[in-house]
A protein has these predicted regions:
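N-terminal small/polar loop signature for handling phosphorylated ligands or for N-terminal nucleophile
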Residues: 42-106, 189-249
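Phosphate-binding and adjacent anionic-ligand microenvironments
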Residues: 273-451
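Short beta-strand-to-turn element immediately C-terminal to the catalytic PLP-Schiff-base lysine
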Residues: 110-113, 247-251, 329-331
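Gly/Ser/Thr-enriched, mixed-charge loops and adjacent short helices
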Residues: 106-231
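An N-terminal, well-structured beta->alpha segment
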Residues: 1-61, 65-67, 145-171
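Proline/glycine-rich low-complexity loops and linkers
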Residues: 124-157, 161, 251-324, 328-330
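Short glycine-rich phosphate-binding loop at a beta-alpha junction
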Residues: 41-47, 71, 172-174, 276-282, ...
């Protein structure tokens, strides 16, 4: 079985099974991980992908041969590995998942002690080198032990601490787990909540009979939106396969962009934690900054990407961090991202709103700071395009380069970023209460980018 480093990315390992991610790769990762991170005991779990158990067995074999004990938490979501690693005081955690990729993929995400992220510049490249070169030490004299652990009840109990359950209204909520790993979690939480949950594709199934669980894709949204409209639900939630991201739909079935969720969740935390810091990414910013400042919070900008966000949150002791890509991070969840905490906070904010619908709560913000949404353009020379745009717009605006190129004017601003993996430039534009200006500037920039 060939072992190549093609699947090693900036934040995880991900590739087609068995060509790029396979049992031999997993075994070698297991042999390497304890040496590189000093881990004596590691949590291991897998999502619903069909190759998950085989990769888990090979990974576990490698870990135990390296003398490392394994806590096998079984089928789970990525955040449950974060939780188990921190909650049980382990030396690391490995989640077998390819998140929202098609079913032929699998992969691994890694954390060290305290559920701190491992990315390319904090150890992932070292894993790749040791795996491909087979430079890990000889097997330990005493192999590690394997124990099975069920962390579901402790995890659910922790998740529910983020809201006052007694104050939640009995909403009807559509929950679409996309045949991913979130189904059993929803079932376990249901008995503690006053909601009527309308379940869609709730059975975990690695064949993905209803499509890839990736609600960011336009074609996957209608399944949730349709049921919201048909059942008269108060709102809808959809998750990706390993449920580290959740996506919200209002009572009309309209998709709520992740940007506005960052502001909404900032509000949830700052109402309870006066003066706290919150983290936001540079793509779209004005709504989040205004909400934070109005509530006496400290908004702090950070480059997008989970390793950057988590490090910045620790640095400034931020209570919450959000990215418009629907990743939401929580200080009391070991600074990790969760796809289960956000929808509960939305229900809590709605419950305290005096009967307002989700669309009513969101509309004011969306009208105040309308956005283009992220628009992708394929270009032959991304760097040249970035330089050209900066030369044209930079001199008359305020330029920042925390993440890509941001240029700000009185009434509008934009952010332009290059993709790390493809010849694509991503554009986000926002204005102050001016949809006509938004269209004008978005069209103008796209013409310039694609010229």
């Amino acid at each position: 079985m060939a072992v190549i480093d093609k699947g090693f990315g900036a934040y995880d390992v991900r590739g087609i099974y068995p060509d790029e991610v396979n049992e031999e790769l997993a075994y070698r990762v297991g042999r390497s991980f304890p040496t590189l991170f000093g881990a004596k005991k590691v949590a291991v779990g897998h999502d619903i992908r069909l190759s998950g158990p085989a990769i888990r067995d090979a990974l576990t074999k490698g870990l135990t041969e390296a003398g490392c004990d394994v806590v096998d938490i079984g089928q789970c979501g990525t955040e449950m590995i974060y939780f188990a690693t921190a909650h049980l005081g382990l030396g690391g955690g490995i989640m077998i998942t390819a998140s929202h990729n098609p079913k032929q993929y699998n992969g691994m995400k890694f954390v060290r002690a305290e559920a701190r992220p491992i990315s390319s510049d904090t150890g992932l490249k070292d894993i790749a080198a040791m795996v491909v070169g087979e430079t890990y030490p000889a097997p330990a004299a005493v192999p590690g032990k394997i124990e099975k652990a069920d962390v579901l009840d402790a995890y659910v109990k922790h998740i529910l601490t983020y809201v006052d359950v007694s104050r939640l209204k009995p909403y009807k909520i559509v929950v679409n787990t996309g045949n991913g790993a979130a189904g059993p979690i929803i079932n376990a939480m249901e008995k503690f909540l006053p909601f009527e949950l309308v379940k869609v594709y709730n059975e975990p199934d690695g064949n993905f009979p209803n499509g890839v669980p990736n609600p960011i894709l336009q074609e996957n949204r209608e399944a949730t939106a349709k049921v919201v409209r048909e059942t008269g639900a108060d709102f809808g939630v959809a998750w990706d396969g390993d449920f580290d991201r959740c996506f919200l739909f209002d009572e009309k079935g309209d998709f709520i962009e992740g940007y506005y969720m960052v502001g909404f969740l900032s509000e949830a935390f700052l109402k309870k934690n006066k003066g706290a810091s919150i983290i936001y990414d540079p793509r779209l910013i004005w709504n989040t900054i205004e909400i934070a400042e109005q509530l006496g919070g400290k908004p702090v900008m950070c480059k997008s990407g989970h390793a950057f966000i988590k490090d910045k949150m620790r640095e400034v002791n931020a209570i919450y961090g959000g990215e418009m890509s629907a990743h939401h991070y929580f200080r009391d969840f070991s600074y990790c991202d969760s796809g289960q905490i956000p929808w509960l906070l939305v229900a809590e904010l709605m419950s305290a709103s005096g009967g307002k619908t989700l669309s009513e709560l969101m509309k004011a913000r969306m009208d105040r700071f309308p956005t283009s949404g992220e628009v992708n353009s394929t270009v032959s020379d991304a760097k040249a395009v970035m330089d050209r745009i900066e030369a044209k717009y930079g001199p008359s605006g305020k330029v920042t380069k925390v993440d890509g190129l941001s240029v700000e004017f009185d009434k509008w601003r934009f952010n332009l970023r290059m993709s790390n993996t493809e010849p694509v430039i991503r554009l986000n534009v926002e204005t102050r209460q001016d949809k006509a200006l938004l269209k004008e500037k978005t069209d103008e920039l796209l013409a310039e980018i694609r010229a």
